[in-house]
Amino acid sequence: MIILSNKPNIRGIKNVVEDIKYRNQLIGRDGRLFAGLIATRISGIAIGFLLAVLLVGVPAMMSILGVI
């Protein structure tokens, strides 16, 4: 006769469940990050362009006008 325990060892199942939860959180975090990047790409490009114009254009214009 086989004796069955009333307290089975489910450590392996718990480890798999924890691994699945962790991977699910990583996938969700990646999805939210990507959605945020897509939502702000136009404003980011515009801000970068304006910053480049300020850093390059203003000194160039001052040089052309003879201020520097």
Swiss-Prot record:
The protein's job, in short, is: Part of a complex that catalyzes the formation of methyl-coenzyme M and tetrahydromethanopterin from coenzyme M and methyl-tetrahydromethanopterin. This is an energy-conserving, sodium-ion translocating step.
Q: Does the keyword Nucleus apply?
A: no
Q: What catalytic activity is recorded?
A: 5-methyl-5,6,7,8-tetrahydromethanopterin + coenzyme M + 2 Na(+)(in) = 5,6,7,8-tetrahydromethanopterin + methyl-coenzyme M + 2 Na(+)(out)
Q: Which organism is it from?
A: Methanothermobacter marburgensis (strain ATCC BAA-927 / DSM 2133 / JCM 14651 / NBRC 100331 / OCM 82 / Marburg)
How does the record say this protein sits in the membrane? Single-pass membrane protein
**Might you give the EC number(s) for this enzyme?**
7.2.1.4
Which coarse location class describes where this protein primarily resides? Answer: membrane
Which pathway is this protein assigned to? One-carbon metabolism; methanogenesis from CO(2); methyl-coenzyme M from 5,10-methylene-5,6,7,8-tetrahydromethanopterin: step 2/2
Q: What sections of the protein cross the membrane?
A: 45-65
Q: Which GO terms describe its biological process?
A: methanogenesis, from carbon dioxide; methylation; one-carbon metabolic process
According to UniProt, the name of this protein is Tetrahydromethanopterin S-methyltransferase subunit F
Q: Which family does it belong to?
A: Belongs to the MtrF family.
Subunit field text = The complex is composed of 8 subunits; MtrA, MtrB, MtrC, MtrD, MtrE, MtrF, MtrG and MtrH.
